[in-house]
Amino acid sequence: LVRKSCERLYEGRMGVWNGSLKAELRPAEKVLAKKTRSFTAAPLDTLLGAKVCVDDFNNWFYSKNMECPWTVGMTKFYKGWDEFLRKFPDGWVYCDADGSQFDSSLTPYLLNAVLSIRLWAMEDWDIGEQMLKNLYGEITYTPILTPDGTIVKKFKGNNSGQPSTVVDNTLMVLITMYYALRKAGYDTKTQEDMCVFYINGDDLCIAIHPDHEHVLDSFSRSFAELGLKYDFTQRHRNKQNLWFMSHRGILIDDIYIPKLEPERIVAILEWDKSKLPEHRLEAITAAMIESWGYGDLTHQIRRFYQWVLEQAPFNELAKQGRAPYVSEVGLRRLYTSERGSMDELEAYIDKYFERERGDSPELLVYHESRSTDDYQLVCSNNTHVFHQSKNEAVDTGLNEKFKEKEKQKEKEKEKQKEKEKDDASDGNDVSTSTKTGERDRDVNVGTSGTFTVPRIKSFTDKMILPRIKGKSVLNLNHLLQYNPQQIDISNTRATQSQFEKWYEGVRNDYGLNDNEMQVMLNGLMVWCIENGTSPDISGVWVMMDGETQVDYPIKPLIEHATPSFRQIMAHFSNAAEAYIAKRNATERYMPRYGIKRNLTDISLARYAFDFYEVNSKTPDRAREAHMQMKAAALRNTSRRMFGMDGSVSNKEENTERHTVEDVNRDMHSLLGMRN
């Protein structure tokens, strides 16, 4: 495919590029000014050949960021922005030049200059030279398919979807900047003493000596001579006010940290265009990362993230460990390259295991913030969320050293408890408060009494209850304590006595003992996961013994199943779900029941078997998927209550008499017709 693309490019056969509007929210001012941005995507047959032409030069270009006057290929993290801003001398005048309608204003003259630079840097290869010339001819004069089906051919401007857009734009601004400096009378040597600038695409950032600030006034005119519209009036004396690529650097601990405008960060949270809940969580995490440096904003985003993780379906993702999170120490490491201290890590580990010693909740999510409280605990629906202060923000990585230390602490506390018990048993006359090491509080004679907080009763006398002769037929005291398990009273599974009778019947028919039944039922459960529990199945079912198939008759399974085989197998629902999850932990596994229903989400595989028991803990997506699969399996199916009755005869006596002159055995004559 790459060779065919190169061949097309060499022969000058242009592809049709696809023009479309950018999927973005634009300010009202931009919309009213009709500055809607478009995107021009390269066709595949041009794209592959184009990458062959430009990739080597582009990779070299990226490697020279900050060494040369461009930042293409730099990272804003790990003190990258600090290195960038410190390239500008202190006390100079800083200008963030603003270019408007950049791509559409580029002239063929500038594009041809980029072509000349690439040809100069290219190895001696005649075929590649022709491909490169044809590529930039196609970029300049591009056939574009518009959304209404019209194909137009442009004659100027760069294409936003070509594989070297940013590098080419940077080169064209670089050429124009050198042109403006030369025209202002500065050669290479004098330029280095009075001007430092960096470019990234159409973004231009300039630092100029105060004695030469007037030169900026002539730059707009010089840029316009080459077709570019730039404004050089935004000038600053403080580096922190300098905007470049929509970022400005703010000083935190003497390091310049790149920051977007707070409104842009909030917009990441406001505009939800994600199709999957995982993508929504990733967007919130991205906003959390971008907000670091704006203390209050980061705190509010963490609070919002805490709330989101309590809502469906995000709470299910968190329980499965699929909710991304970045700690305060992780963010500090990302921006400043500083590792978290051992004290911070140990504080986190201590707090973690302190919470873990109790009953393990369904979900533990640790959140860090800049709030004054060290830890704020919020509990909702068995969900524990911890807010951790910045001072104790630590990384979540656990190492063996901390685990060993925690085990030692546990052993010491156990010994201490045993010692206290022994001391308490020696003195039986010691009061309870003394045994526990706590003193009774003195009574304050000046108190005026206590107030009792009223409790609302679950059942009141005002409830409308079923009654006979004025007396309620319900025992409310018993009802308050009666909380049976749903599965124990569900009519979708056989009762325990029915299951035991089925077990005994199958065991006797198969001639197995209890230990053999355990192994056999493992195989039966896996077979039913794959093949279902329809009452119409017959023949044999199969279990594997290594590479050998072992057959078992199905008849005993169905005969002893009351009320139905599916209701018997419902007892295996939880084990089957765990088995599928276990298989998916080591390989991609979807039961045949899910494959037949074309279930594409592998995370729902654990619910893709027909004897799964839906309960109140089943996630909404899983419940919907299971119901849809069941509806698809049962569609247009019907069962006959009666088959053909073989004992009923439809015989009758035929008293018809025929002679040899009759036409046939059903007709005496042809009613007068003759041959």
Swiss-Prot record:
Name of protein: Genome polyprotein
One GO process term, biological-process aspect: viral RNA genome replication
One Pfam family from the record: RdRP_1
Record-level GO cellular component terms: viral capsid
Originating organism: Papaya ringspot virus (strain W)
Post-translational modification remark: Genome polyprotein of potyviruses undergoes post-translational proteolytic processing by the main proteinase NIa-pro resulting in the production of at least ten individual proteins. The P1 proteinase and the HC-pro cleave only their respective C-termini autocatalytically. 6K1 is essential for proper proteolytic separation of P3 from CI.
Family to which this protein belongs: Belongs to the potyviridae genome polyprotein family.
Residue spans of biased composition, Basic and acidic residues class: 390-424
A GO MF term: RNA-directed RNA polymerase activity
EC number: 2.7.7.48
